[in-house]
């Protein structure tokens, strides 16, 4: 999913669809997603579809662009939350039950100017599900955090095959 999201963000930036913040930074803050992105970069012909390969033929990397930052260390991850500029943070969620996403939620859920976009399934009983179902407050690291950010869900990027995909 991370690579699909990067593909779409590259297009959004290339088409100047974000007015006033065209050069916004994008952080991939998941060590596994960073490794997967590296695999995509090293195996272009096996990983990209026809549309992405057309970009490659034009000398355009379909999942890279100015402002893309790959966060590896925990120090790099923590620093993201202290930058004041508008930004996109792509962080593996684990349904918001563990990992770096919890720190990003702690620093951004209370901010009405923030948007948290879920692109994966959130199981019943998880923090992610509570947030998408409209929780007004959640607990992170033992602290109550008011949910004032805009919460959105995009279901078109499942990381799992559907029934037909499994049969193939």
Predicted regions mapped to residue ranges:
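Acidic/His-rich, metal-assisted hydrolase cores and their charged scaffolds
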Residues: 1-168
């Amino acid at each position: 999913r991370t690579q699909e999201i990067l593909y779409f963000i590259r297009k959004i930036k290339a088409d100047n669809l974000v007015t006033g913040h065209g050069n916004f930074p994008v952080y991939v803050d998941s060590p596994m997603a960073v490794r997967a992105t590296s695999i995509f970069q090293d195996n272009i012909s096996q990983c990209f579809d026809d549309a992405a390969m057309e970009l490659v033929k034009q000398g355009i990397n379909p999942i890279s662009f100015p402002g893309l930052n790959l966060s590896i260390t925990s120090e790099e991850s923590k620093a993201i939350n202290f930058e004041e500029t508008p930004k996109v943070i792509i962080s593996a969620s684990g349904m918001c039950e563990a990992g770096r996403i919890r720190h990003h939620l702690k620093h951004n859920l209370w901010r009405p100017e923030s948007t948290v976009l879920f692109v994966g399934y959130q199981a019943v009983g998880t923090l992610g599900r509570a947030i998408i179902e409209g929780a007004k407050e959640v607990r992170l690291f033992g602290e109550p955090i008011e949910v004032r950010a805009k919460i959105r869900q995009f279901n078109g990027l499942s990381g799992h095959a559907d029934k037909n995909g499994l049969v193939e």
